[in-house]
């Protein structure tokens, strides 16, 4: 692998990215493949932090729309992200990558509490840091948690790994005329209501001028390509 273009990155994965083709739960082959690629990125000298969603286990928003109390549903979603975080930690440590999970909700038996300075020390020592339990507050998505943590640790970029190879004008699986955007501004994303991140997360990135790159995580080698500065997917940045 070449020299990393970005020295410190925050990789945001949806929970569904861990589910593979089965669509729910955690697919061992998928998580092992992602872990192997992360190992190569860290070996190149890049510092990598992770935020993983929980949608493969529980979707708080969907549950609240069916009548469940929104705060309770969101807390359940945060616990789902912790299950994914611990699974990813296990997959990484099995292949020799030092990994720490930091939780925004206290659960000292399984994870460190989130402490910004400690997280940054781990990264400086070449460890992968996984931020679990979102922001620790209901009504905030894991996208917003990813934006917040990226700012706090001084990341150069947020890499959002999805199942499509960028941002489209419509769902490419449903609409064959959907156009892929190679580049977008934050305002274009917000005005067009594009599914990059939710509005809160996008606004946070815009206010702090943090670029977002949306790319296809299902193709092996793409994380390395993005970290090395290769132009794949869609780049979202200021004017």
From Swiss-Prot:
PANTHER family: URIDYLATE KINASE, URIDYLATE KINASE PUMPKIN, CHLOROPLASTIC. Residues 20-25 are annotated as: Involved in allosteric activation by GTP. ATP binds at residues 12-15, 55, 59, 162, 168, 171. Catalyzes the reversible phosphorylation of UMP to UDP. UMP binds at residues 54, 74, 135-142. Homohexamer. Belongs to the UMP kinase family. Allosterically activated by GTP. Inhibited by UTP. GO terms for molecular function: ATP binding; UMP kinase activity. It is found in: Cytoplasm. This is Uridylate kinase. Pathway: Pyrimidine metabolism; CTP biosynthesis via de novo pathway; UDP from UMP (UMPK route): step 1/1. Its main location: cytoplasm. Pfam families: AA_kinase. One of its GO terms (biological process) is 'de novo' CTP biosynthetic process. The gene is pyrH. It catalyses: UMP + ATP = UDP + ADP. It comes from Geobacter metallireducens (strain ATCC 53774 / DSM 7210 / GS-15). Its EC number is 2.7.4.22. Transmembrane segments: none annotated. Keywords: Allosteric enzyme, ATP-binding, Cytoplasm, Kinase, Nucleotide-binding, Pyrimidine biosynthesis, Transferase. It is an enzyme of class 2 (transferase). One of its GO terms (cellular component) is cytosol.
């Amino acid at each position: 692998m070449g020299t990393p273009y970005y020295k410190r990155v925050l990789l945001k994965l949806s929970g569904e990215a861990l589910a593979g083709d089965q669509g729910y739960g955690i697919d061992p082959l998928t998580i092992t493949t992602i872990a192997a690629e992360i190992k190569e990125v860290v070996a190149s000298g890049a510092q990598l932090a992770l935020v993983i969603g929980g949608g493969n286990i529980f979707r708080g928003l969907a549950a609240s729309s069916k009548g469940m109390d929104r705060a309770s549903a969101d807390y359940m979603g945060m616990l789902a992200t912790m299950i994914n975080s611990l699974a990813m930690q296990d997959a990484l440590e099995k292949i020799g990558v030092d990994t720490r999970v930091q939780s925004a909700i206290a659960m000292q038996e399984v994870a460190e509490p989130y402490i910004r300075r400690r997280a940054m020390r781990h990264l400086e020592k070449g460890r992968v840091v996984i931020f679990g339990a979102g922001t620790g507050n209901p009504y905030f998505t894991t996208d917003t948690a990813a934006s917040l943590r990226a700012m706090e640790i001084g990341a150069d970029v947020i890499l959002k790994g999805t199942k499509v190879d960028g941002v489209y004008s419509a769902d490419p699986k449903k609409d064959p005329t959907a156009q892929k955007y190679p580049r977008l501004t934050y305002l274009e994303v917000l005005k067009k209501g594009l599914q990059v991140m939710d509005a809160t997360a996008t606004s946070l990135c815009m206010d702090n001028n943090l670029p977002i790159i949306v790319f296809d995580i299902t193709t092996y080698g793409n994380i390395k390509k993005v970290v090395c500065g290769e132009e794949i997917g869609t780049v979202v940045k200021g004017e």
